[in-house]
Amino acid sequence: KNSGYKIYDNYVYGFNIGDLVSTIKDKLNNNLIMIKNGQDIISTGTVFNLNNQEYIAVLYGDINGDGKINSADLLKMRQHLLGMIELTGPFKKAASIVNGTSINSADLLRIRQHLLGIKNITQ
């Protein structure tokens, strides 16, 4: 069954902000075995096991891993761009919104546009 999710290097893309673990389990015919962050909401960094393979969820714009896109994510991206922190793993991937490879001012602009309701970030 095609779930609509994309998998690259054990990272899974295509979740929507607010998706629940229970909803995902239904979409995947209950083949989702284990969630490691213990929340019911899917967020960047959620680790799960599907068919004996471990995967990590990535939600574009959810840079701090709380399952939302908000000013905290904007701050994390700003700090990364200024060299104050270094985003790694799924959080770095969640921040590369525009081209999926690097993080730059265009990604910062996309989060601002999302927060202002000008243009939503698509997963």
Regions found by a protein language model. Give the residues of each.
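Cellulosome-associated attachment modules in secreted, modular CAZymes
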Residues: 2-123
